[in-house]
Amino acid sequence: MARLLIAASGTGGHLFPALALAEHLPDYQIEWLGVPDRLEQTLVGDRYPLHSIAVEGFQTRSVLKNLQILFKLIRGIFEVRHLIKTHHIDVVFTTGGYIAAPAILGARLAGIRAILHESNFIPGKVTRLLSRFCDRVALGFAGTAQYLPKAKTVWVSTPVRSPFYTPQPLDLPIPENVPLIAVIGGSQGAIAVNQLVRQCVPSWLAAGAYIVHLTGKNDPEAETFKHPHYFALPFYDNMAGLLQRANLAVSRAGAGTLTELAITGTPSILIPYPFAAEDHQAYNAQVFADAQAALLYRQAELTPEILENAVLNCLKHPETLESMAKQAQRLAVLDSAQQLATLVNGFVQVT
């Protein structure tokens, strides 16, 4: 039996593509590498053996703190090497983030293959630094290759989980014949977007819309507005059903979410997270805006009035939503997970 180590941690954007790949490798023994007390503890659960190492990113100007982080990284590299040896791992797959550094370098130290998936249009620091040490870098956006001239890249888009490919019933009391707005802040929520949206909700409800607002778990005002047609939820595990049913999404622009919007053909208003590393969400969103699959607004320029009217204008012009939906579907790559699985299989066979 082939053995794969998946290193994916922290956010849905890192975890969901890795889970989608794992679904397409049913005959593999999969070990999962994460970080203590992160989202993988919930999402991976007992589906795969979960191993944790204590690593973090270099995000401080303190020399002492950076030395401590460097020590953790070096220790993590040897912990990964030990994990690879004791579990007879054939290939390492990672979706980036700081867990990727010990995973990639540990694979090199152990003498096995490493595959990195970069979902964002602008590659992260770890990807730029370590892509040359990977046997292949799979890309979520074709245009990303220009930023990784020394890497062996292949464009596969970003995989999504299997429920997105089949109709999923929405288990919320929402009639079929009413417009539905889905507000998505990503796996960690988006308080700034939440605050904007709550000021717009009364007018959207007055226009006859229902609203499912995924607030995240850290919004202290999440339950301040009540209405029978407004559903404020910290997290919703039937994202496929929600996006398939939604007439319009108001969303951040993480690569995983954008891929899900494309697969489901959901028109969107995108508000990139302004503090994302390298402003990568803005670049992700621009691809969708250029394709006329989404409307793009920068958070610094967005007022409640602008957002309110943008949504109302979309609801008043269903032909616009229909056109945006078609353009979103044209961006979808339906076999992304299978392409990644084939890539992994190829490296196992030559190991």
UniProtKB/Swiss-Prot annotation:
Q: Which UniProt keywords apply?
A: Cell cycle, Cell division, Cell inner membrane, Cell membrane, Cell shape, Cell wall biogenesis/degradation, Glycosyltransferase, Membrane, Peptidoglycan synthesis, Transferase
> Gene Ontology terms, cellular component aspect?
plasma membrane
Q: What family is it from?
A: Belongs to the glycosyltransferase 28 family. MurG subfamily.
Q: Which reaction does it catalyse?
A: di-trans,octa-cis-undecaprenyl diphospho-N-acetyl-alpha-D-muramoyl-L-alanyl-D-glutamyl-meso-2,6-diaminopimeloyl-D-alanyl-D-alanine + UDP-N-acetyl-alpha-D-glucosamine = di-trans,octa-cis-undecaprenyl diphospho-[N-acetyl-alpha-D-glucosaminyl-(1->4)]-N-acetyl-alpha-D-muramoyl-L-alanyl-D-glutamyl-meso-2,6-diaminopimeloyl-D-alanyl-D-alanine + UDP + H(+)
Regions that span the bilayer = none
Report the protein name in the record: UDP-N-acetylglucosamine--N-acetylmuramyl-(pentapeptide) pyrophosphoryl-undecaprenol N-acetylglucosamine transferase
What does this protein's UniProt record list under function?
A: Cell wall formation. Catalyzes the transfer of a GlcNAc subunit on undecaprenyl-pyrophosphoryl-MurNAc-pentapeptide (lipid intermediate I) to form undecaprenyl-pyrophosphoryl-MurNAc-(pentapeptide)GlcNAc (lipid intermediate II).
| Name of the gene this protein is made from | murG
UniProt-listed GO biological process terms: carbohydrate metabolic process; cell division; cell wall organization; lipid glycosylation; peptidoglycan biosynthetic process; regulation of cell shape
**UniProt subcellular location:** Cell inner membrane
Q: In which pathway does it act?
A: Cell wall biogenesis; peptidoglycan biosynthesis
Catalytic class of the enzyme: transferase
Quote the PANTHER family the UniProt record gives: GLYCOSYLTRANSFERASE, UDP-N-ACETYLGLUCOSAMINE--N-ACETYLMURAMYL-(PENTAPEPTIDE) PYROPHOSPHORYL-UNDECAPRENOL N-ACETYLGLUCOSAMINE TRANSFERASE 1
Q: What is its EC number?
A: 2.4.1.227
Gene3D superfamilies from the entry?
Answer: Glycogen Phosphorylase B (3.40.50.2000)
Pfam families assigned to the protein according to its UniProt record, in alphabetical order: Glyco_tran_28_C, Glyco_transf_28
